[in-house]
Curated annotation (Swiss-Prot):
GO terms for cellular component: cytosolic large ribosomal subunit. Keywords: Ribonucleoprotein, Ribosomal protein, RNA-binding, rRNA-binding. Belongs to the universal ribosomal protein uL6 family. InterPro entries: Ribosomal_uL6-like, Ribosomal_uL6-like_a/b-dom_sf, Ribosomal_uL6_a/b-dom, Ribosomal_uL6_bac-type, Ribosomal_uL6_CS. Pfam families: Ribosomal_L6. GO terms for biological process: cytoplasmic translation. One of its GO terms (molecular function) is structural constituent of ribosome. It comes from Rhodococcus erythropolis (strain PR4 / NBRC 100887). Part of the 50S ribosomal subunit. NCBIfam families: L6_bact (TIGR03654). This protein binds to the 23S rRNA, and is important in its secondary structure. It is located near the subunit interface in the base of the L7/L12 stalk, and near the tRNA binding site of the peptidyltransferase center. The keyword Ribonucleoprotein applies. This is Large ribosomal subunit protein uL6.
Length: 179
C-alpha cells in the first residue's frame, strides 16, 4: 500500500467537497478548484468528513497513481483554504521589476522591457524593485508561472545575476585564471 496514498485527507471547516465519479470539486473561502482523478483510483467521503483515496489492485500503474491522486486532492484543499505563494528575487545591476496594473514588467538587461501578463487566478505583489511574489490558489499554476519568470534570465553561475527563487542557492563557478 502506498504510504502517502493510505493517509486520509482532512477537510477543514468551511470547505465543501463534491465528488461525482472521477471528478472532485472543492469550494473554499479563496475560490473553487476542480480535479479529475485517473481511472483506477477511487475517492470516497468518510463519515467524519475526511476523504480516502483507494486503489482496486496492486498493479504498477495503480500504485503509482495512488499517492499522486491523494497529494493532488490535498493540494487543492490547501489551495482553496490558504493559497500558495512563491517569493522571488532579482540579482544584477540594473535588473528590476515593476507592477503595471495587474501585470509585471521586467528590466533584465535586454534592449526592451519584458512584460508578463497575470493569468486568471494569479496575483503578483512587488515588495521592492528586486523582490516580488507570485500568489494563487492553484499550486501547479503558481509554480509554472514562477518557473517561466525565472527562465527569462536564469541565474548566471559565474556572477550570480538573474531571477531566482527566494533562498535558492546558486552553484557558482570559478572564472578563468589569467597568466
Amino acid at each position: 500500500m502506498s504510504r502517502i496514498g493510505k493517509i486520509p485527507v482532512t477537510v477543514p471547516a468551511g470547505v465543501d467537497v463534491t465528488i461525482s465519479g472521477q471528478d472532485v470539486t472543492v469550494k473554499g473561502p479563496k475560490g473553487t478548484l476542480a480535479l479529475t482523478i485517473s481511472e483506477p483510483i477511487a475517492i470516497e467521503k468518510a463519515e467524519d468528513g475526511s476523504l480516502s483515496v483507494t486503489r482496486p489492485d496492486d498493479e504498477r500503474r495503480s500504485r503509482a497513481l495512488h499517492g499522486l491522486s491523494r497529494t493532488l486532492v490535498a493540494n487543492i484543499i490547501t489551495g482553496v483554504t490558504e493559497g500558495y505563494t512563491k517569493k522571488m528575487e532579482i540579482h544584477g545591476v540594473g535588473y528590476r521589476v515593476a507592477l503595471k496594473g495587474k501585470d509585471l514588467e521586467f528590466a533584465l538587461g535586454f534592449s526592451h522591457p519584458v512584460p508578463i501578463e497575470a493569468p486568471e487566478g494569479i496575483t503578483f505583489v512587488v515588495e521592492s524593485p528586486t523582490r516580488f511574489s507570485v500568489s494563487g490558489i492553484d499550486k501547479q499554476k503558481v509554480g509554472q508561472i514562477s518557473a517561466n519568470i525565472r527562465r527569462l534570465r536564469r541565474p548566471d553561475p559565474y556572477k550570480g545575476k538573474g531571477v531566482r527563487y527566494e533562498g535558492e542557492q546558486i552553484r557558482r563557478k570559478v572564472g578563468k585564471t589569467g597568466k
